[in-house]
């Protein structure tokens, strides 16, 4: 196993522990708490994949961070912070919408890279909007936290989420996954549109009312791809 992979996991475990302590003291806002919950699932998946104990990794990560802090001068820290571009966290969904449990009558699921696409194929003839919470850097989607499809009544009928065991995805991966979800929903004569935030940063091929511009052949192709169940 690559030593950098192990040390990266150890540091991530310790930093998650620090963030959890901050949350326990009620110092974190909604995006902070949301990322904390998502990252916990990711760390569990990575730990299982690597065969590493999280508690042991957290202690090792603490030692790595302490060693770096001992060697780091205040001036070097200021320069590092100034040179790192800041990402923004954008939210279409409330914390309740993100954490709400939902069920599918006719479940379909597909894994596309490090993203999991789920939808209820029992949904027909509905107006559906896609909402997402994600981070942006350089005016491009950096990391998808969660995307969900909602009917006008507020029911959840589809979802795209990162796989905890396979961290890392590009904005193009997200766009392709959105296309698959849209194609599957439109196959059942649903009308799908994306939120303004998604239009701007993740799904740029939309017309003026926010509906995706997909030709019929591409819709059918995307709908067929979601037939592959995990």
From Swiss-Prot:
Upon interferon induction, ISGylated via host HERC5; this results in the impairment of NS1 interaction with RNA targets due to its inability to form homodimers and to interact with host EIF2AK2/PKR. It is found in: Host nucleus; Host cytoplasm. Its main location: host cell. Residues 223-230 are annotated as: PABPN1-binding. GO terms for cellular component: host cell cytoplasm; host cell nucleus. Residues 1-73 are annotated as: RNA-binding and homodimerization. This is Non-structural protein 1. It comes from Influenza A virus (strain A/Whale/Maine/328/1984 H13N2).
């Amino acid at each position: 196993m690559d030593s950098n992979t192990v040390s990266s996991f150890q540091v991530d475990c310790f930093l998650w522990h620090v963030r959890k302590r901050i949350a326990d003291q009620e110092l974190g806002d909604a995006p902070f708490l949301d990322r904390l919950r998502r990252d916990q699932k990711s760390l569990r998946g990575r730990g299982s994949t690597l065969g590493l104990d999280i508690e042991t990794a957290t202690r090792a990560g603490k030692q790595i961070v302490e060693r770096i802090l001992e060697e780091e001068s205040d001036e070097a820290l200021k320069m590092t912070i100034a040179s790192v571009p800041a990402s923004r966290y954008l939210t279409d969904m409330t914390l309740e919408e993100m954490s709400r449990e939902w069920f599918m009558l006719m479940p379909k699921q597909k894994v596309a890279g490090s993203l999991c696409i789920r939808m209820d194929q029992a949904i027909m003839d509905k107006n559906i909007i896609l909402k997402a919470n994600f981070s942006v850097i350089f005016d491009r989607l950096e990391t998808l936290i969660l995307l969900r499809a909602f009917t006008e009544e507020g029911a959840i009928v589809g979802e795209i989420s990162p796989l905890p065991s396979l961290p890392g995805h590009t904005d193009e991966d997200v766009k392709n996954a959105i296309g698959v979800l849209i194609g599957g929903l439109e196959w059942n004569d649903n009308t799908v549109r994306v939120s303004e935030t998604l239009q701007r940063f993740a799904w740029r091929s939309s017309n003026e009312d926010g509906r995706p511009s997909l030709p019929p052949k591409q819709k059918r192709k995307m709908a067929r791809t979601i037939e592959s169940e995990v």
